[in-house]
Amino acid sequence: MPAIDLSTIDLRAIKPSDLDWRKFTLDTGHPMRRIFIWSVAVNMGIGQSGERLEKAAKVMSELTGRTPSYRLAHKSIKDFGIRRGEPIGLLVTLRRNEAVWFLLRALAAVDFTLREESFNAGNVSFGIREHILVPGSRYDPALGIFGFDVAVTLARPGFRVQYRRRARADVGKDHRVSREETIRFFQDVLGVRILKR
């Protein structure tokens, strides 16, 4: 049973404050074993700086409600006209209510259908070809159409130990989220259909 009945809500009008990210968890019987959405990263690779990148930044901030950070080129590629250190992409990381809010809208853009190959241990990635497919977004001829990638990371309570500054430690193998659990989370909690290979 999905955590939210999508037939009763309008994804074009929903706001992050209307959602509670704690409801979007997969209960596995023990409070420390429950699985939840850790983060949703939205990435746009533009491949060039300048006006097109600024337009993409405007589109991304409208989509996510956050100011994107600029991603820089790691090396110079003369054929593409890219210099090292030049901004060529955008990234926004969303957490908690904003993450669930954006993920529901992004999944609606792909009809709540994902390929089995998109899943690995605790992570899911998928792309959207045109940002206007996302409910609530609008087409602006002055900006154009951009595609983007969505990367979702799932976690369990206690995962913070691998990111904290003091007394950092690895998460045990048995406590990590497996690929099967990731697929089950998306099917049971978000109501996603999985396309087999």
Identify what each model region corresponds to.
Residues P2-R197:
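Ribosome-associated RNA-binding proteins
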